[in-house]
């Protein structure tokens, strides 16, 4: 009953008004799975290729009709009649047929949309929720946890048109007992932050990920206004709520220096920028820093890991791009201690699960993540629970493309109850 009988690809619109690929996989018995590929703004150079048309007369060149054509043509032909429950087999067929290292023939956006739609269709055929099916695919049936959200409440860098260099300033409601309570806490801080910003005459327009995007005097001021909002919401910073940052440092790495344009073009070496971050961790309870240096600055990352790696979580995003080959090298060299998981960086569910497993086996944490260009697709919520990853990044408390994932987590927690504990601070590397 899980034989694939029809595959449909279409061009839909993402949260930035750009096209993306949506796929449907239909099975015998009327079971259907549907999924859409997300899209990043600050991207690692070694990510799998997101195929765009390049036709400037349509969507300013960002159309995805070639990728959609791959779904409706060669991909559909190759997987029709195959068993959707064999996720690894379906993904292998598509990857082998594409025939390139970075999925540039069909596009990672095409392959991923079909991969996720196939998983959803198989879950439907098995009569189970997606998170349960993912746990089975992961070899960990029945093992779940609810992830600690990293809520991006101030957006900077490539995610906003402001003067803040560091891309994401996040809160983690580690003191909550459930994910539903964590979401409530995050919402309360988010609304108090608006009041704090308005009180200072600052803008409360939001960036790509739903966080506020004010102009600030320094990157440290972002932490200061968040600290004010946490206190105003009635929480204790460092106890109920901790802080995290995504520097996305590749975006301000120029000629071997880290240049903070928003702070008068201050330039830092790798070591100096590491100590700049170290000072921030002494002033504020920052427990996680993502991409604290450029993706190619491996010597710098080795130094940063030596300085900060036993104190806080150091997450590799552009650094590792959800790629097991790169992650393996990082583990061997002792680079960072956590990986950000974005399934469109690698382009299939099977490869994503392999990256999560490799990280966990090496004692690294895995943080499941959205992209700045999203849709209403909430698959990452099921992925986080089904792999018991423990942490999730899915933006702030506004924009339906972000909130869709939080709402799905609430539903899943309601269904699983005590089978999916919310472990709070224990999930974060160096904080147990």
Curated annotation (Swiss-Prot):
Keyword Repeat in record: no
Gene3D superfamilies on file: Enolase-like C-terminal domain, Enolase-like, N-terminal domain
Pathway stated in the Swiss-Prot or TrEMBL entry: Carbohydrate degradation; glycolysis; pyruvate from D-glyceraldehyde 3-phosphate: step 4/5
Main localization, broad class: cytoplasm
Requisite cofactors: Mg(2+)
Binding site for (2R)-2-phosphoglycerate: 167, 342, 371-372, 393
GO biological process: glycolytic process
Co-factor note (free text): Binds a second Mg(2+) ion via substrate during catalysis.
Active-site residues per Swiss-Prot or TrEMBL entry: 209 (proton donor), 342 (proton acceptor)
GO cellular component term of the entry, any: extracellular region
Reactions mediated catalytically: (2R)-2-phosphoglycerate = phosphoenolpyruvate + H2O
GO terms, molecular function: magnesium ion binding; phosphopyruvate hydratase activity
CDD domains (UniProt xref): enolase (cd03313)
Enzyme class: lyase
Binding site for Mg(2+): 246, 290, 317
Compartment(s): Cytoplasm; Secreted; Cell surface
Its EC number(s): 4.2.1.11
Keyword Iron: no
Keywords annotated in UniProt: Cytoplasm, Glycolysis, Lyase, Magnesium, Metal-binding, Secreted
Family, per entry: Belongs to the enolase family.
PANTHER family found in the cross-reference section: ENOLASE (PTHR11902:SF1)
Subunit structure as annotated in this protein's UniProt entry: Component of the RNA degradosome, a multiprotein complex involved in RNA processing and mRNA degradation.
Described purpose of this protein according to its UniProt entry: Catalyzes the reversible conversion of 2-phosphoglycerate (2-PG) into phosphoenolpyruvate (PEP). It is essential for the degradation of carbohydrates via glycolysis.
Protein known as: Enolase
Organism: Salmonella dublin (strain CT_02021853)
């Amino acid at each position: 009953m899980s034989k694939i009988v029809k595959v449909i690809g279409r061009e839909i619109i993402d949260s930035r008004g750009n096209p993306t690929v949506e796929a449907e996989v239909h099975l015998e018995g009327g079971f259907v799975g549907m999924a859409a590929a997300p899209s990043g703004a600050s991207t690692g150079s070694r990510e799998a290729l997101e195929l765009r048309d390049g036709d400037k007369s349509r969507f300013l060149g960002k159309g995805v009709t070639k990728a959609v054509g791959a779904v409706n043509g060669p991909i559909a032909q190759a997987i029709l009649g195959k068993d959707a429950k064999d996720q690894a087999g379906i993904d292998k067929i598509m990857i082998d047929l594409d025939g390139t290292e970075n999925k540039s023939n069909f596009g990672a956006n095409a392959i991923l949309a079909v991969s996720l739609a196939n998983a959803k269709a198989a879950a439907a055929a098995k009569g189970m929720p997606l998170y349960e099916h993912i746990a089975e695919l992961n070899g960990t049936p029945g093992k779940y946890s609810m992830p600690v959200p990293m809520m991006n409440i101030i957006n900077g860098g490539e995610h906003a048109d402001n003067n803040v260099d560091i891309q994401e300033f996040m809160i983690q409601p580690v003191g909550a007992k459930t994910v539903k309570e964590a979401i409530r806490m995050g919402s309360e801080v988010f609304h108090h932050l608006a009041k704090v910003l308005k009180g200072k005459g600052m803008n409360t327009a939001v960036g790509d990920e739903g966080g506020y995007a004010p102009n600030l005097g320094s990157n440290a001021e972002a932490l200061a206004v968040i600290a004010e909002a946490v206190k105003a919401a009635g929480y204790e910073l460092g106890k109920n709520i901790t802080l995290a940052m995504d520097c996305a440092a590749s975006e301000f790495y120029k000629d071997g220096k880290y240049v903070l344009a928003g702070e008068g073009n201050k330039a830092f070496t790798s070591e100096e920028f590491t100590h700049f971050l170290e000072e921030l961790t002494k002033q504020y309870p920052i427990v996680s820093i993502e991409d604290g240096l450029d993706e190619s600055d491996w010597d710098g990352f080795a130094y940063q890991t030596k300085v900060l790696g036993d104190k806080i979580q150091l997450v590799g995003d552009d650094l590792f791009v959800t790629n097991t080959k790169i992650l393996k090298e990082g583990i061997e060299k002792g680079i960072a201690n956590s990986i950000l998981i974005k399934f469109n960086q690698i382009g299939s569910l099977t490869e994503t699960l392999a990256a999560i497993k490799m990280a966990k086996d090496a004692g690294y944490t895995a943080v499941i993540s959205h992209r700045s260009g999203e849709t209403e697709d909430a698959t990452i919520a099921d992925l986080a629970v089904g792999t018991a990853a423990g942490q999730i990044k899915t933006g702030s408390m506004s924009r339906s493309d972000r909130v869709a994932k939080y709402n799905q987590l609430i539903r899943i927690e309601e269904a699983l109850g005590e089978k999916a504990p919310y472990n709070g601070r224990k999930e974060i590397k160096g904080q147990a």
